[in-house]
Curated annotation (Swiss-Prot):
The active site is at C185 (cysteine persulfide intermediate). Belongs to the TrhO family. One of its GO terms (molecular function) is oxidoreductase activity, acting on paired donors, with incorporation or reduction of molecular oxygen. Its EC number is 1.14.-.-. The keyword Cell membrane does not apply. It is an enzyme of class 1 (oxidoreductase). It comes from the Bacteria. Keywords: Oxidoreductase, tRNA processing. Residues 130-225 form the Rhodanese domain. SMART domains: RHOD. It catalyses: uridine(34) in tRNA + AH2 + O2 = 5-hydroxyuridine(34) in tRNA + A + H2O. Gene3D superfamilies: 3.30.70.100, Rhodanese-like domain. This is tRNA uridine(34) hydroxylase.
Length: 285
């Protein structure tokens, strides 16, 4: 019986021949019947793929056989079996698109000049010790935060990751430069870059949630500082860490509580829109 699984991971490390890595990763993933998206650049690899658990395990073992990827933090979750339409493996200037590849510096230990990594329990200790001096800073697209975010987090007004550089340069967050800023995102990759961009712009004390929201949810579920659902970039659209998750999202049609996204352009040109099950049924009827 097939057991569908999804794995998410990234590694920042210098890659002399990204195209060779792309070909190897495509061959490895295809041979194991996986679908999903893998991005490769001179800075490393960023992958989200899914398939049957036995195939995924073989892929993970093969990926870790390459020395620079041997310590990759693999995040596992349950899939649906048809979570991605196809397998896509591409070389790009960046493995997460901030539009600032020239600013990123990477060595064998990862991103140079990034924020200090904090495990979930270390984040709690920081908040307990520093209180209001600690600010959570969302490193995701704005729509993702509509259904879930850390309590009292700063959520930048961005619709794509490319807009973060302009946001940081706008000055609207300069009042946070003397705060303890904890950046967070889904699995950690965006905050690797975001935290380095913030530090280079004068933010004095920048941290990043190690392993992202995924690892935090595994550790604390809905009993900690996280509230709501987590948006994910596959057919599932969102996941919860427990049956106690709050519903923060609001239906774009009736205003009722929902965490359901649909691909449906609204009057602001957005394709992903929050629509509750009742409104979906009424529209279909």
């Amino acid at each position: 019986m097939a057991v569908p699984k999804i794995v998410l991971f990234y590694v920042f490390t210098p890659l002399a021949d990204p195209e060779a890595i792309r070909l190897w990763q495509y061959t490895l993933a295809e041979a194991n019947n996986l679908t999903g998206r893998i991005l490769v650049s001179e800075h490393g690899i960023n992958a989200t793929v899914g398939g049957d658990i036995r195939d995924v395990k073989r892929y993970v073992k093969g990926t870790r056989s390459y020395a620079p990827f041997k310590d990759a933090d693999i995040k596992w979750s349950d899939g649906l079996g048809d979570d991605f339409p196809r397998l896509s493996v591409k070389v790009r200037p960046e493995i997460v698109t901030f539009g600032a590849p020239g600013e990123l510096k990477v060595d064998a230990d990862g991103v140079v000049g990034g924020g200090t990594h904090l495990a979930p329990d270390e984040v709690h200790r920081l908040v307990e010790g520093r209180g209001d001096d600690v600010v959570f800073f969302d490193g995701r697209n704005g729509f993702e935060a509509e259904i879930g975010r850390f309590r009292d987090a700063v959520v930048p007004d961005v619709s794509t990751t490319r807009e973060f550089v302009h946001e940081l340069d706008s000055g609207k967050y300069d009042h946070l430069k003397d705060k303890a800023v904890v950046t967070y995102c889904t699995g950690g990759v965006r905050c690797e870059v975001l935290s380095s961009l913030m530090r280079s712009r004068g933010f004095g004390e920048v941290y990043q949630l190690d392993g992202g929201i995924v690892r935090y949810g595994e550790a604390f579920g809905d009993t900690g500082l996280w509230e709501g659902s987590l948006y994910v970039f596959d057919k599932r659209m969102s996941i919860e860490f427990s049956d106690q998750a709050k519903t923060l999202g609001r239906c774009s049609t009736c205003g009722g509580p929902t965490s359901r996204y649909e691909n449906m352009p609204d009057d602001r040109g957005r394709e992903l829109v929050l629509v509750c099950a009742d409104c979906t049924e009424n529209r279909a009827g």
